[in-house]
Amino acid sequence: MSLSCGDLANHNDRVVSLLNVCRKAPSFARTKALHALSITLCSVLLQPVYVCNNIISLYEKLGEVSLAGKVFDQMPERNKVSFNTIIKGYSKYGDVDKAWGVFSEMRYFGYLPNQSTVSGLLSCASLDVRAGTQLHGLSLKYGLFMADAFVGTCLLCLYGRLDLLEMAEQVFEDMPFKSLETWNHMMSLLGHRGFLKECMFFFRELVRMGASLTESSFLGVLKGVSCVKDLDISKQLHCSATKKGLDCEISVVNSLISAYGKCGNTHMAERMFQDAGSWDIVSWNAIICATAKSENPLKALKLFVSMPEHGFSPNQGTYVSVLGVSSLVQLLSCGRQIHGMLIKNGCETGIVLGNALIDFYAKCGNLEDSRLCFDYIRDKNIVCWNALLSGYANKDGPICLSLFLQMLQMGFRPTEYTFSTALKSCCVTELQQLHSVIVRMGYEDNDYVLSSLMRSYAKNQLMNDALLLLDWASGPTSVVPLNIVAGIYSRRGQYHESVKLISTLEQPDTVSWNIAIAACSRSDYHEEVIELFKHMLQSNIRPDKYTFVSILSLCSKLCDLTLGSSIHGLITKTDFSCADTFVCNVLIDMYGKCGSIRSVMKVFEETREKNLITWTALISCLGIHGYGQEALEKFKETLSLGFKPDRVSFISILTACRHGGMVKEGMGLFQKMKDYGVEPEMDHYRCAVDLLARNGYLKEAEHLIREMPFPADAPVWRTFLDGCNRFAEEQRNTLNVVSFQ
């Protein structure tokens, strides 16, 4: 029984209706069944174009591009929709050759490309510059670029993907119409490359124009903040997102957590995480990554352990972050457990995870396991080699260089990081060989490699050769190598030369000023240090924590409380005061040496993340000012919080006991040092001898000296004799009083 034309059309319409239903919940089995039904109703040669187009579209949506291609190839006739649909499919899944072939065929049959054609081709991830510029020209020729913002936005994304930022900016400027999506893509492009200033310019323009900002508007800028680590702008964007009601959107929350973490404000990152109404795996990865970079990286491991309680399973990004934490604190057993979890859960150890494992074992000093992980990876890339080389560079220089040569023989081209790593472990002969390889491969003018070469020559006591490298550089030398030279001068004690070189820089950066300030500080040019710091502020160069540490160290040396308090006020304005533990520790030390215990306690209480150094600095300050009992209580509190005291912690508490006359407590702690894995050194014995001698326990002090595992030095004997003299003087004074009575 044959179907009439009307019946056939009705059946085809029903097939298309069913295909549209299937599109809402795509299923390969249902699509194939409908495809078979359409062939049954009428042969392949009689299938209408609109039916075939729908089948191609659904196969493309399911990722079955080869089947979509077969349907396209068998079509008796095609229209522009047919060509655009299959071009989109091939482009989406990276088959640029087939996409371009269909595009050429389309033009051959006289079909002019439209926006859908060009945007489909531009979305292909593997499209090269030549093809991209050709499409750019065609879009201008056929008026597609000028029609609306869609094609221009696609071109902008393509140039961004190809890292052609200037071309992307030119496209943006030439576009007659710009959609919000265009602006968002441009900001994202700039943000991901760390151009925060330019990114913020576009963001402020959008705000000025009264545009309705979306999540994407914030994401690109926040990425730029993360790259540049600008805390002030992070806060501004946070406020702006709150005003727009976007601060609860999970993607914005995740980006803010990441930005605060990268800027070193772990407190705000944790607060954002806790205040979020809901989390996803990206939220967990962001907070783990943020806390991993904090003063207490073990928090990241605790968060990792708590993930299953909240219904989340770690993914590749999570494992990479926690392996980084394990390597940072050198917890070999913890990292091994994570490695075991990966194997148990059947996680495939690809390039990213493999590199993380290589790096973890290398940083923990287990080069054997690091090499095993390296050998296990099938398709190695240069990152794998860099991770392995970095491990051997810190432990075994000759093997590191042997691996470097092996890498070259296997055809891998070194990056600037590869050279920098290999240069760490060079002796003079190997350094000269590597230098020749660097020149041969054209890296001699690379600032990063040039700086590493200078450090290596300086490390091998070849200072003049290090300085000559600047003269040999063919291109204009940036501030980075010049900073290295200034640093070399400073370490050699040539402070005048260091400051003189910095003063010749047209645009010295924060590091330049820090080197000059540190150089003057080391040579005790106190007034010059203050003048340099003032000049730095007048030049609108933002001080960092190292600048403040240098100035605060000078305040400690001079016991200048007024200057120290002024610097503290400036630190508070730049938001370093509570967020940065390193700065807080130096502030505690400065106030302690200047005799302001009240300020010491205030800074200590305001410090958000206290580490062992924070507690040790407080104990030291309390001890030297006679608050022995309070120092002892703080030491006990340190232990109760899980901190493991080190050699400096014990010197601080023994000094506190010595000043407070607490012989029993002090000697009890001295005897327990080994329980905490700390072997008493000469400084500890000196404190213990002084504690005993100055309190009249001369026999015990002498016995302790005789029992020392190494010969006592002159200061130990001097301490003992001072105690003897003091005790003898006290006895004479007592006898005189008795005689007088």
Curated annotation (Swiss-Prot):
Q: Does the keyword Repeat apply?
A: yes
Family annotation (Pfam families): PPR (PF01535), PPR_2 (PF13041)
Q: Name one GO biological process term.
A: RNA modification
Q: Which domain of life is it from?
A: Eukaryota
Is Cell wall biogenesis/degradation there in the keyword field? no
The record's annotation in InterPro entries points to: Pentatricopeptide_rpt, PPR_At4g14850-like_plant, TPR-like_helical_dom_sf
Residue ranges of PPR repeats: 48-78, 79-113, 114-146, 148-178, 179-213, 214-248, 249-279, 280-314, 315-349, 350-380, 381-414, 415-445, 446-481, 483-508, 509-543, 544-578, 580-610, 611-645, 646-680, 681-715
Which GO terms of the molecular function aspect are on file? RNA binding
Please provide the record's keywords in A-Z order: Repeat
Q: Extract the NCBIfam families matched here.
A: PPR
State the family named in the UniProt similarity comment for this chain.
Belongs to the PPR family. P subfamily.
| PANTHER family noted in UniProt | PENTATRICOPEPTIDE REPEAT-CONTAINING PROTEIN, REPEAT-CONTAINING PROTEIN, PUTATIVE-RELATED
Protein's name in the database? Pentatricopeptide repeat-containing protein At3g58590
